[in-house]
A protein has these predicted regions:
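Structural/interface elements that position substrates and couple domains in central-metabolism enzymes
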Residues: 1-240
Length: 240
């Protein structure tokens, strides 16, 4: 997707981007204004999708003979839905989703409309975070596995884990944490000195009373969590 209002700019951007991919992705040329709306709308749509599946996960929590991941796997086979970004897990965060959700809400307001769907998505996100926090505060020692906003990244901007760490520290709860990137800890803006860094995820489990698995990474599936309270919304320990 290229946003430009003249052919010279279109050609220049195409020339730059041709070296960044090996395949031939579809190309869509839009005006600058169309591209801006499209970019924000894309993430806003994904936020709605994530919010729905996270709401569904909370509805299914505690039901007998119900595993939400079996349900979403089945629904995701429908081509109208697809399995992408359709998995119950932790609240969305990072640098793009919260920002673009807020931008779309402002865009709608400027057009004299109320983006109620995205406001509800943000409420679902906040409720999901609160439910994780409420479960953690019942324990004196809490382990956080995965502190960046997504796997394979050291970025903690807008990370639910970083907020969880801060809120637990404020409640005088001892926090143990593991992340595959050392840089993730240095990006915590001072919080890294108030937590206990673990070298392995199993060490994090062993030293904690309760564990929150915040990343959907199957390398955590073999963790021994016996006698621990575990928050595993992603279903990592179930092999989902």
């Amino acid at each position: 997707m290229i946003g430009a209002n003249n052919q010279r700019d279109i050609n220049m951007v195409q020339e730059i981007w041709k070296d960044f991919h090996d395949n031939e992705p579809p190309l869509k040329i839009l005006s600058l204004e169309e591209a801006e709306v499209a970019k924000v709308s894309l993430n806003a749509f994904v936020v709605n999708k994530i919010a729905f599946v996270n709401f569904l996960g909370q509805l299914c929590d505690g039901m007998d003979n119900v595993n939400v991941h079996n349900i979403t796997d089945a629904i995701g086979l429908d081509k109208r839905i697809s399995p992408y970004f359709f998995k119950f897990g932790t609240p969305y965060g990072g640098t793009c989703f919260p920002r673009d959700s807020a931008a779309f809400i402002r865009f709608a307001s400027n057009r004299k409309r109320d983006a109620k769907n995205l406001k509800f998505a943000d409420e679902v996100n906040a409720d999901l975070y609160q439910s994780i926090l409420d479960k953690c505060v019942a324990y004196d020692k809490v382990g956080i596995i995965g502190i960046s906003f997504k796997p394979n990244s050291p970025v903690v901007i807008g990370s639910p884990s970083s907020k969880l760490i801060q809120d637990l520290i404020e409640k005088n709860i001892t926090v143990f944490a593991y992340d595959e990137f050392d840089e993730s800890f240095s990006n915590l803006n001072g919080l890294e000195d108030k937590i206990i860094k673990c070298k392995t995820p199993q060490e994090c489990v062993d030293k904690s009373d309760a564990i929150a698995i915040m990343h959907p990474d199957n390398k955590f599936s073999s963790l021994n969590t016996s006698d621990k309270f575990v928050i595993d919304n992603w279903g990592v320990l179930d092999g989902n």
